Amino acid sequence: MTEATPHNHAFDRAIALTAAGPNLFKGNVDDSFQNMVGPFGGVTAAILLNGALQHPERIGEPISLTINFAGPVQLGDFELEAIPLRTNRSTQHWLLLQKQNGEVVTSGTAFFATRRETWSEQQHDMPAAPAADSLPRVERGERNWFRNYDFRYVSGLFDPNRSDGNPEDAHSETLLWTRDNPPRPLDFASLTALGDVFAPRIFHRRQRFTPAGTVSLTHYFHADTDQLARAGDRHLLGQARATRMHNNYSDQIAHLWSDDGQLLLTTTQVAYFKE
């Protein structure tokens, strides 16, 4: 098998940007990460973050990222404005705007900072789970983007064709191992996308498809570049759940840990659903 390294991996091709002027990049959306409506939201979020990561004025590393999916992203070319709104001694605030045909399709803000060594503590431990290699990979072909990820479910598999006689689950929680497929060394861009691999919580709660999608997400990065490098291309353990689904909208809270138990990402999002 050909080794997948950054730049020849499908993910890196999907988030690739070309500088086109001050605070401006250009890119292209193909169908390799296509979802129900437009591309997988995680790769769109990674594209916007990449604009800040590639910017010549960037300082520090990502601490938080908020993405708002304003409208459908179409196949084809786009422009990305990555604007450093304010740069302080060790912090930086960003405005990110993805545009197609002159209209904003995705907006975002990001907070970067230079981390200083301090006292640290992790209060949310990784749940107990069988090793990733002991679980079968779930092959899913409903959407193009599924092929780009390795999913190994511990619990909470969404299966609309289940035959256990239960039409619904009692909760919305999912616990799974996941990573890029083929494996790719973890970095901030790929962690951004992995933070959005969880299907809408209403799918899991009710075990059936319904029109649904993320409207806004916020990632909190708990790791630095060195910690991500230590995670390598191994699986991450992800846990996601909803706290309330009400009148067309649902939240989701999720976490991703490295296989040695380090919490790398906390993410929250709001999704719409229709009936």
Residue ranges and their predicted role:
Residues 1-275:
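Terminal targeting signals and extreme-terminal segments of soluble enzymes
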